[in-house]
Amino acid sequence: LAILAIASLSAAAGTGDAVFNKAIAAYKAAKGIAVKYSMTGAVGNSSGEIIMQGNKFCITASNMICWYNGKTQWSYSTMSNEVSIMEPTASELQVVNPFSVISNFQTAYTATLMKGNASSNIVQLRPKNARTSQFSQVVVTIAKKTNLPSKIIATMRDKSKISITLSGYRTGGNFPASTFVYNKKYVPAGTQVVDLR
């Protein structure tokens, strides 16, 4: 949060674009990625692992599992003991998976480079269409060594914030398609499935 309060803009949006385009290239070059995450803020606190490949992902945490195969999303919650099925919009995906900000950057956001440090660049993203975006802004810290995000702070339209720290990247994976599709063996027997499509 201090970053948002004290960081000064240090370059034009085009420079922010260049930094973020490097992040997009690094994400694509990494192919399959697994990364540990820790999240705090408006939607509660959680930690776990995100596995990503192209536009697919699987998020595993202590209280939920979420699968997305590029079209359909299955979300299991330990609190409700049910699996919900939906076909999310691009805007909805950004709330579930922070890396969706990267894949939607060129069409959805304008980038400005902020004051970083010796090891990281910091880029502020503002939505091109504020009415349809879930966020009013997203600040992404990108490691210079890997060009991959290490922290994401998203400000919702109601001014609440979500902070996500990313660490322990494993790249170059080749995950089977089944990784990103709901499998009942990962949830308790008798779990209710609710189809919201």
Description of each model-found segment:
Residues 3-45, 55-56, 81, 186-197:
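N-terminal leader/targeting segments and the immediate start of mature chains
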Residues 26, 48-52, 65-66, 110-116:
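Short, exposed beta-strand/loop patches in secreted or surface proteins that constitute
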Residues 31-33, 46, 55, 62-64, ...:
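Envelope-exposed proteins and targeting segments
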Residues 38-40, 60, 76-78, 126-128, ...:
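A generic structural motif
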Residues 47-96, 162:
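An acidic-aromatic
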Residues 88-120:
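Flexible, surface-exposed loop/linker segments and immediately adjacent secondary-structure boundaries
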Residues 109-111, 116-187, 194-196:
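Gly/Pro-enriched, hydrophobic low-complexity segments
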